[in-house]
C-alpha cells in the first residue's frame, strides 16, 4: 500500500493502525505485570506504580513520538524505511572505511530483528491466551497447546496471502485500541490519583529511591515500546503522515489510558498484579476481551511475519542472503509476498520457544535486548544521515545523538541483566543471521573475484570473434553476465567445448539499484557491441523481483526483439572447493558451500523456462 494510490487519508490511517501498531499495541497485555511482578525486589507499592507509569509515559513520548516519528522517519529512500535502508542512506557520502562500519551496524540491526521476530508471536499470543487463567483457572494447562494451534493456523494461511484477511485487521485493531482506552478510562475515573504519574518527577524519584534495582527494572519498562521499529520499517506502505496521525490520534492516547488504568487498579487492588490487563474488565466482558486480545495478537504476529518476509527479500536483493523462492500473493500489491523457507523455519523456531519457555513471563526475560540494541544502532545511523546527507550542523547533530544515546544505552544495558535468563536467545539468533549474511556477501565477492581475475577483455574477444567467427547456428543466445567488462564463463566454455556461436548473442546483466523501485523507463539499457553482440543491463530496485520475460518485453519496445521460446539461455554452474585457508576461514568457506547448495537456482530465480536453459559447469577454488 502506498500513499500514491487514491485512497483517502482516513482509510490509509485506519490501515496503518491495523498493520503498523500491532506489536506496540499489544504490549499492555504484559508490560505493567512484568514491571511490578516482584522480580526486582519490590511489590505493588505506590511509589513503584507511579515511577513505572511515569517511565512508560515518557518513553512513549521521547522514543516513539520524538525520536522515531519526528526524526528517524525523515530518513527515507524513495519513501521506504527500515534498518537496511538506513544503512544504505548513511553510507552514501562517507569514506570507504566509515561505510564498512555503517554496513556492519546495519547488518547487526537486521540480525537483531531476526532474533526479535521469533519472540514476538510467541509472547503476544501466549499473553492473550493466558487470559484463560482468569476466566477458567483449570484451563491453564491448555495455554501452550492453544498458543501453538493459533500460531499454526496463522503460519498455514501465509501461502494464500493476507489480502482478504488483511481487510479485517484495521477494524479489529481500531476496536482493540478503543477497548484499551475505555477500560483504562473506566479505572482512572475510579482512582484519578494515578494521573500524578504524568509528572516526570516520579520517574526521577523512582531512580533515587530504588537506586540500582530501578536501573535493572528498565529491562521491563522497555516492553512498552517493543515494535517501535515497525513504524519506520512500514513507512513505505502507508506514508509518514498517516502513521504519525494514527499514533497521535488513536494509538498513543489509548496506550496511555490503558497503562494508567492498570496502575489505578493496582493502587486499589494490589492482588490484581497476576493479570492487571484482564482484571480491568468486568466479569461479563472477560470472554469477549479474551477473544479480541487473541485476534489482536495474531494481527501483531502477522505484521512481524510480513516484516521478516520484506527484510529477507531486501537482504536477498542486496546480496546479503542467498537467493530463495519468493512468491507474490497479490497481483495488486508488490509488498505482499510469501517466502516458504523463511515461513516454516520461523514457525519451527516459534513453537520451540513456546514449548521451552511455557509462559509469557518467562519469555519477557528474553525480550528487549534485540529491540534496544537496534535502537542504539538506529540512533547512530540516523544521525549520520542527518550530518552527511542533510548537512545539518555537526554540533546540533552531536547533541541529538547524545540525547538519544542517553536513553538508548541505559535501556540496552539494563536488558543485559536478562542475558542468562533468556536474553541469550535473540542474541544467539541474531549472531547466527549476522554470520550467514556476512559469510554470503564476503564469500560471494571472493568467488566473483576469483572467477574474473583471469577473465579476458570483453571488447578484445568480441573483436576477435567477429574477425574470425566460429560456426554460427541460427537463433539467439543469452549469457548471464555478472560483470560488464568480462566475458561470461558460460560463453568461454561453450566456445571451448562446442565451438559454435549463435547468430545473435546477448550478454544480460541484472543489477540491483540502491532504491526500492526502478521506473520502467530506466528498466533496460541496450548497447550494441558489434554486429552480432548486444549488452543488456536490466535494473531493479530491492523491493522488486527480476523477471527475464519482462526484460525481453522492454527490449522489444526498444528495438531488440527477443522471443523467450526461441532463445537459449547459457549459464555457468560453479562447482566450488575450499582452498588452503586458516581454520576459521575454512569454516566460513564450508558454510558458504552449504548456503550455495541450498540456494535457488538462477533459472528459477529469474523465471526462465527450464527447457530453454543450458548450464555449463566449472570448478572454482575459493
Curated annotation (Swiss-Prot):
Subcellular localization: Cell inner membrane
Key words of the record: Cell inner membrane, Cell membrane, Ion transport, Membrane, Potassium, Potassium transport, Symport, Transmembrane, Transmembrane helix, Transport
Membrane topology value: Multi-pass membrane protein
Swiss-Prot/TrEMBL catalytic activity: K(+)(in) + H(+)(in) = K(+)(out) + H(+)(out)
Task of the protein: Responsible for the low-affinity transport of potassium into the cell. Likely operates as a K(+):H(+) symporter.
Superkingdom of source: Bacteria
Listed name of the protein: Low affinity potassium transport system protein Kup
Family listed: Belongs to the HAK/KUP transporter (TC 2.A.72) family.
Pfam families: K_trans (PF02705), K_trans_C (PF22776)
TM regions (residue ranges): 9-29, 49-69, 103-123, 137-157, 165-185, 213-233, 247-267, 276-296, 337-357, 363-383, 396-416, 419-439
A GO MF term: potassium ion transmembrane transporter activity
Organism: Salmonella typhimurium (strain LT2 / SGSC1412 / ATCC 700720)
Cellular component per GO, a single term: membrane
GO BP terms: potassium ion transport
Principal subcellular localisation of the protein: membrane
